[in-house]
UniProtKB/Swiss-Prot annotation:
HAMAP family on file: Ribosomal_bL17
Name of the featured protein: Large ribosomal subunit protein bL17
PANTHER family, A to Z: LARGE RIBOSOMAL SUBUNIT PROTEIN BL17M, RIBOSOMAL PROTEIN L17
Ribosomal protein found in the keyword field: yes
GO molecular function: structural constituent of ribosome
Species: Tropheryma whipplei (strain TW08/27)
């Protein structure tokens, strides 16, 4: 007997789950964001991203396949005419899930799933993290000298650890004040 392989079902059965995911994705496409439980948002994300990928192909066959899944003509029109051209150059990553706290009634973790429609540029590796000057750390470069260890300096120039106060506000007598 075949068993579900995509994790636990959100609703009573697979047919009802497909209907719930279709309705939630239609709301996501019409409103650009949706507040729901965290588990539902995680189940909705791949479902919605596959529909966006299908809409990027365009064409009548893709439109009819998406309509058979969505069952909402307004959401289908929004998906194919407004959303698909904005994400045409991107390969995935069309949605973002943000945790927003807990529901007041039963304490269920809530999340906001939203479409990422602003253009995202490709990352440039390492150019932002490189320093402006290159520091030579080869075998010829010497480490920075430790203060007091230069030739010609006396060892008595540095204060002793047991005579110097640890805290600037602390007195050197180390007496405790009892109140």
């Amino acid at each position: 007997m075949p068993k579900p392989s995509r994790g636990p079902r959100m609703c009573s059965g697979p047919d009802h789950e497909r209907l719930v995911l279709a309705n939630m994705s239609a709301s996501l496409f019409l409103n650009k964001k949706l507040r729901t439980t965290e588990a539902r948002a995680k189940r909705l994300r791949p479902f919605a991203e596959k529909l966006v990928t299908l809409s990027k192909r365009g064409g009548l066959h893709s439109r009819r396949r998406a309509l058979s899944i969505l069952r909402n003509k307004a959401a289908l029109h929004e998906l194919f005419t407004n959303i698909a051209p904005l994400v045409e150059d991107r390969n995935g990553g069309y949605t973002r899930i943000t945790k927003v706290g807990f529901r007041s009634g039963d304490g269920a973790p809530m999340a906001l799933i939203e479409l990422i429609l602003e253009p995202v540029s490709a990352r440039t590796r390492g150019t932002d993290t490189l320093p402006d000057t290159v520091i030579d750390t080869g075998p010829d470069s010497a480490p920075d000298p430790v203060p007091g260890s230069e030739p010609g300096s006396a060892a008595g120039d540095l204060p002793d650890a047991d005579t110097a106060p640890a805290d600037p506000g602390e007195s050197s007598s180390n007496q405790r004040v009892i109140r």
